Amino acid sequence: MADHDLVLKCWGAVEADYAANGGEVLNRLFKEYPDTLKLFPKFSGISQGDLAGSPAVAAHGATVLKKLGELLKAKGDHAALLKPLANTHANIHKVALNNFRLITEVLVKVMAEKAGLDAAGQGALRRVMDAVIGDIDGYYKEIGFAG
């Protein structure tokens, strides 16, 4: 619970512009981990140079951050939010668990820069995401997805 609160202290800066911050997160993810772009077939027609300014990338990034905000605000009581997300990410998108770890590291960096997330908050975000990823892993196992 305390970890969620540490992260939520800075969440207002993220909420203030979900599209810009979400676009930043996804673009950094694609730049730092180019293989992750393959998980987003709807961006396949966008050249690497045009990804940064793409409204589609920003919109999807906003969706990601809004869902993360819901998970943070649930403060660990997130089964109703997380189970359907795990289901779609396993059955439709085929997202391996490691990709959630990769985006976590990008989130930590972006929140440090854009929202003032300090070292304690960064550790808190990593711990929260570790718990979320652990729960996703449990759901993946339930449905037989080797993520």
Swiss-Prot record:
Binding site for heme b: H89
One BP annotation, GO: response to hypoxia
Domain Globin, first and last residues per copy: 2-141
Superkingdom of origin organism: Eukaryota
Any single GO CC term annotated in Swiss-Prot or TrEMBL for this entry: sarcoplasm
Main location: cytoplasm
Subcellular location, record wording: Cytoplasm, Sarcoplasm
GO terms, molecular function: heme binding; metal ion binding; nitrite reductase activity; oxygen binding; oxygen carrier activity; peroxidase activity
Catalytic activity from the UniProt record: Fe(III)-heme b-[protein] + nitric oxide + H2O = Fe(II)-heme b-[protein] + nitrite + 2 H(+); H2O2 + AH2 = A + 2 H2O
EC numbers: 1.7.-.-, 1.11.1.-
Alphabetical list of PROSITE patterns matching this protein: GLOBIN
SUPFAM superfamilies (UniProt xref): Globin-like
Family to which the UniProt record says this protein belongs: Belongs to the globin family.
Protein name, as recorded: Myoglobin
Natural source organism: Danio rerio (Zebrafish)
